[in-house]
Amino acid sequence: MDADSINSFFLIGALLTAVSVLLSPMSSRLGIPILLIFLAVGILAGEDGPGGILFDDYSTAYLVSNFALAIILLDGGMRTRVASFRVALWPALSLATFGVAITTSITGVMAAWLFDLHWLQGLLVGAIVGSTDAAAVFSLLKGRSLNERVGATLEIESGSNDPMAVFLTVTLIAILANVGAELSASFMLISFIKQFGLGVLLGLGGGWLLWKLVNVSKLAEGLYSILVLSGGLMIYATSNKLGGSGILSIYLVGLFLGNKPTRGRHAILNVLDGMTWVSQIGMFLVLGLLLTPSDLLDIWLPGLALAFGMILFARPLAVWLSLLPFKSFGSRDRWFISWVGLRGAVPIILAVFPMMAGLPGAQLYFNLAFFVVIVSLLVQGASLTTAARLAKVELPPKPLPISRSGVEIYPKSEWEVFVYCLSESKWCIGEPLKRLAMPDGTRIAAVFRNNTLLHPSGSTCLEAGDILCVLGQEKSLEALSNLFSQAPETDEVSRFFGDFFIDTEVKLADLAPIYGLTLDDETGAMTVADLVALELGAHPVLGDQFLWQSLHWVVAGLYEGKVTNVGIRLPADA
């Protein structure tokens, strides 16, 4: 490659990236996933588009996609709270193993019938598209206030279901590439255990070593993110090299670092946020360039049948069977989890495996994977907001600061500055600072009014439009945000939680005359907390609800895993 070619490469790459960024606001206006915008830019720049760029280097696409996916999973792991594993780990693992196997089997049968394939080839197609995609799930769920059990289950499933898909794909390729040869059950079992076992072992062990290394190193602030990124990629590559799941490993590395007091944590997250955007853009641009849309015309009708068969039949059946042991999931939860079986980069990456192995029909597998991904993003991704509303799994948005940043006062510092803009509706307008009931361990560090820094004292009265900079820790974020930030509309809160909020220590007998409850001696002695435990089990989450005596009872407050109050919706409001 000469200097002119290199400059052309930089120019085209920068131009496509800039166009992707500038077109990204269209996703919210059109109601489509932003990943589809990036993919469309790549397709338009490709062989069949006005750009006319000829790109068919599957090895480069595989390299770029794996690198990008590793960064996305590292960032996603660092933003996942380990507390969510309390309610979502086992359901997510069931979906990541049994769910993938069931989806693969059903989709494989449909593929074999629709495309007149050998049943093993059909299963290979099912394995390729059988897992949900972490990049798509993290991207589309980011910023949404979903029921914790549902949201955490989807995120953990997407971060942990790739080992099963990779195991099935690699095993089926080995069988098809050596027709007549038998793969022993012990070999397959060992391969499966290596994928999961090494993935978990290297992820948690490597995460611990990397955490220790980061905290003992004295580096320039900008170097911590590079250390985490390079360390995560080393663990990812090592896991893959030894036969484990690098995808699972790097997700667990991020999870470990994100839930431990880590030096430079906020700076690391800021850098990873930008790197994740670059990775998503780069990955879907390259995959878009790789696709030749005209190749999809020959398979569009059976391809649609396969995609919708997976969306409407295979995925829902897999979800319902996988979640049978978990009674805490209601029918609405299961329906929404079924719908958010998003496919993205991972099926396309897996579809490259048969091409690199030189299998007959590999191009068909690749085109099918691409077709399924496009349909999934268009149908499931674009309707995600509507699906969440219909399933009633999206909570009213939590009040949050307009920005937050870390204060690296000392290693492992957990102090942050939260910035709030006061609206006219806040009760604290006109009140002196000394009358504010601030959470323990927090302090107003600065007040700005009309672009001017004030010198506040206890008698300083707050005005609408004031900007407050508050020093505190994440544990105080909810209380601070309730005090200062813009709260969701009252109608939105009452529509979800109901108009009446009841403390869980109240006895049902005291509520009976108010709400017309019919109680026997046993239920009359129960508190609301007893009723919630009876109906929802040991680990309820915010937004959980149940119907009892014609009233809808909704968990409206939690503290350290314990329900503190519930909302009551009357039948007419349900």
UniProtKB/Swiss-Prot annotation:
Topological relation to the membrane, as annotated: Multi-pass membrane protein
Subcellular location as annotated: Cell inner membrane
Pfam families xref list: CorC_HlyC, Na_H_Exchanger, TrkA_C
GO terms of molecular function: flavin adenine dinucleotide binding; potassium:proton antiporter activity
Xref: PROSITE patterns: RCK_C
Main function: K(+)/H(+) antiporter that extrudes potassium in exchange for external protons and maintains the internal concentration of potassium under toxic levels.
Family to which the UniProt record says this protein belongs: Belongs to the monovalent cation:proton antiporter 1 (CPA1) transporter (TC 2.A.36) family. NhaP2 subfamily.
Protein name per Swiss-Prot or TrEMBL: K(+)/H(+) antiporter NhaP2
Species of provenance: Shewanella oneidensis (strain ATCC 700550 / JCM 31522 / CIP 106686 / LMG 19005 / NCIMB 14063 / MR-1)
GN (gene name): nhaP2
